[in-house]
């Protein structure tokens, strides 16, 4: 059951903003969890367990709406001069009015206390707020929220100077929810079960979904299955493997890609991808990556036969397919085939700097391939 707190509404409950109260992680609409400023800043992370008391603070000051859960900020939204709204959300605007609590399902609502405090508006610099607001008429992210599409970057790394504090602030500013994923494996920051648990104990209370990037092919024996289940999901790529001569290959490093015959090398890459798809992960990322200089002829090497073989193996594995922002892969043809095969999708920055993507390639592929909310992978969020 989803409960919504409306404010600045009227007796018919037709206008004003809505804040979601929904701790049901089994909900089919998994992108409107507690604290969501509905259809403006939808939240994919569940912060509170079911049947658990919590405190939610909603602050409206000038053009800014802030939502805190148990003292932690989850929404910081500034309504711009020209907000983008669909017809269905045309009245989701700041104005004046009353408060209401409504439910769209059956069940009991338990609320201990509701307190309203008046803010001294003379201390608010609305012009300064508006200067910080997003240009929503040219913002694809608000359009996703308005169309009821889950807005989640499933593949973000704390690297290149990006801290969890900066990432959280950036996420609230852009309206893009983040999954933070450490690189786990031999030669990477996390190399054993204890380090995984230490990391999760530190990060579980943060406003992110928590993923794991499984590195290399040795990761399966490096981490226990029980530890892997502590992540909200696990993903891997097929960029590291042994070639046909037994040499350790990392496809993004030219010195480790020994290409004698491009067609034969391409067949080997497809073989390795299909092998990786048998590993126990949830999402296949950096998909269909090709090394330089083959990457310049991506469509040429990914022939119909190779695409069909890959998509068949992917669909059989039950894994989701990432649409990757760093490399702008895979191409439309592969995405269309995967969609037809019933594969689920994720959007992923795979950032190497603090500048996390705006998901522009993913959104373009979403539009061109007709992806809907039902096509997106649902994380198994733990609290």
Label for each model-derived stretch:
Residues 29-32, 189-190, 243-247, 355-359:
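Short, charged, surface-exposed secondary-structure boundary motifs
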Residues 155, 234, 286, 321, ...:
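Conserved, mostly hydrophobic/aromatic
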Residues 4-137:
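Carbohydrate-interacting regions of secretory-pathway proteins
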Residues 119, 184, 239, 289, ...:
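Flexible loop residues that form catalytic
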